[in-house]
Amino acid sequence: MRFRSERQSKILSASNGEAGEVHKASLKAAQATFKKHADGARVNPRVPSAPGNSKGSMDGLVDPIAGLQLDVSGRRSKRGLVGRSLPPGGSANNINPRRISSGVSCGEYDYKVAAAAAARAARNENESIWPPTNAQHASPLLALPPLKLAGTHTRSSSNISMSTLTSGNGSHLSLDEIIATIKVNDPNSQISLKPPTSRRSTQTGAYLSSRESPRGGVDNSTESLPAGGSQYSPGRLHIPPIVINPALLGKDSQAILACSESQASPSHCSETTSPPPNTDGPVLPVRPPAVSSPIQSTYSFRSFSSNRMPRRIPPPCDPLSQLTKNEQKAVPQAAPLLESSEYSGGDSDYDGKQYSKACISETDSALEDDDDFGSGYENFSNAEDYLSSQDDFRERNDNNDNDDDDELDDDNLVESENDATMEQDSQSDDDTESAKEFTVANVSYSTLNKIPMNMTYRGTLPDLIPNYQRKQSKWMKLFKRHGQTGLGPSKNHPPTSHIYTQNDNALVQSKLHVRLKTTMRGILNDSSSSEPHQLSDDSEDSEEDYGSDRNSRSRSPGRRSGKKREKIRQNLRYRNSFNEDKPWKSHLDVGYVTERERKRYEGMWVSNRDTYLDLLPWWNNGNYDETREVPEDGLMLNLVVTDIWSRSNLPQDTLAQIYDMVDTRRDGTLDRNSFVVGMWLVDQSLYGRKLPRELDRRVWDSVDKYVINVNGSNKNPKHHHRTRKKLLKKELKLIKKESKSHNV
């Protein structure tokens, strides 16, 4: 006979230690009881009383734990493998089927008897392991040391083990075995039983407490069997409710929780805390309260940081310490700062208007002059004292300025957009302190330099044109919308220059965006090159410096509001064009100086020739050799040549070698051809070519003034190769024709 299923056997075998000994004792007691019932063949089945019971019954079954006779008349008989009824505790061979009709089978109750015997044996074994407690009706499970619950996953595993052991065929185990199994599956659980007084009774049966035990003494059994009833299924073993309580909070967590609850306001406590649970109902596993930290709560930032004042930059203070106490006005008492409670509110929103007047800072326009800023603003207690003192100081300065500047009126500041006007007062010649007052708008620096008076400039340097405006992409120039000025100055409000004069001294405050002219580079045709509002009519050198974009269309708005049309030829950059910033891209390894290179070198020659020649010992001396003729193109001093060539950052020995190769006069000067060839050799060295031992005649012919031997009509060096091919083709055709005519 199988007493347990394989799953329950595995669960029991997994237990070790003291729990394993209890399981072995329970198993032996259950096997002995079943063997005793299986061997006896009785007509009227009787259950022998337990060792501690002196009372038995021949008419029915007796509960060995409670000592009561159980009524089994309404129970169905157990069927065998062949469909026969079996007596309770008997076999098919020893029982007559005819006599079973009057009796009642007790096969369904056999496992209960075995479980009761196993529970009693386990209780005796348990008493030897754990000493009983001082309470009379205390359960031995309550004497167990309290265990902590590891987590929610252990709680679920405990419930699974309970449902497995108490359902279906798994209900053979006793209460102690179930508890031991739970301990094996969940070693960190805290298990307790309800007291007997809290157990509910049913309609047909009741849980029997230890006081109703027939022994009359104190019964430490934790298991009481129901007498029967419709509410309990016949295949289940009903045990007292087991409550698994979660682990208590640690001391540190309790301290943090108590501290947070004490510091919270009553309104917050009413929201966060919940009413105490009802103790009248069944005890259920309660989730431990979450420990709220100051960082996680919504109101904790304001409550914990209430003593922190709002940050502000202290305003500068004028040197009032130099003034006497009589000159200072009485400053009213400033309102105190807001209390910290105004910032710590969970229900009210945090409003920026709660700042006091001490946090109000002064505008930048009121503090423009650097003279108003002083040191020692720490003397003021708050910002209101500083602001009031700042107003007094400004009023005194205004009064002093008005006394000194009575001769200046607002009518002197007259603005004109196109022309510069000068006004002189008709006064006598004896009055030398007559003021010349005028205002100029859109003036150039050349005009300002022609003003016959002392000029004082105030303001920053003119803004240079940034690279993103100087070098715009071709797509931006082609597809930009009409009227789009980008990040540059607005056309409607052009920058102006104002001049204030007094006593023959002019004060110039300029905000003009001046475009500086670069050397040896053409004017780029970008959007900011020739704006009409940036050019002045009375400026004499405006067209010479900036030039005029005559090919481009007028910039007045047209009828179409779409994309602006511009000529592609003016905006696109051709790859074949020479880039002065990157000359190596247009370099071709040829054995002579090209026409383009010769023109660039001649520009350097013209701008630096015939300079510092008086440093030569023979230049102003009348006894110099007449054989030294000065050419028409002029000469260049060797010191000037060295200065120009040194800008290439080539080694000095390389430059000396180049100078020796091109020097033909041997008198400390170079002529035009020598200078141009020397510049070409410097560029060849920068391109990575080695210096030749001797210069080819073709190089000297290419830099000659008339260029006789070098065909420089076509700039493309591949032109000669193509012409040769054409000549060869023509010659081949002529040869073929001659051969045909000769054959004919």
Curated annotation (Swiss-Prot):
Tell me which SUPFAM superfamilies the record gives: EF-hand
**Which parts of the sequence belong to the EH domain?**
617-706
Q: Which UniProt keyword terms apply here?
A: Lipid metabolism
Q: Does the keyword Lipid metabolism apply?
A: yes
Extent of Acidic residues compositional bias: 400-412, 537-546
Transmembrane feature ranges: none
Q: Does the keyword Lipid metabolism apply?
A: yes
- Polar residues compositional bias, start-end: 198-211, 260-273, 378-390
Q: Where is this region: Disordered?
A: 1-61, 76-98, 187-237, 260-282, 302-350, 366-412, 522-574
- Feature: compositional bias, Basic residues: 556-572
Gene Ontology terms: cellular component: cytoplasm; plasma membrane
The role this protein plays is: Positive regulator of phosphatidylinositol 4,5-bisphosphate turnover and negatively regulates signaling through the cell integrity pathway. Involved in rDNA silencing.
Q: Which family does it belong to?
A: Belongs to the IRS4 family.
- Name-wise, this protein is Increased rDNA silencing protein 4
Species this chain originates from: Eremothecium gossypii (strain ATCC 10895 / CBS 109.51 / FGSC 9923 / NRRL Y-1056) (Yeast)
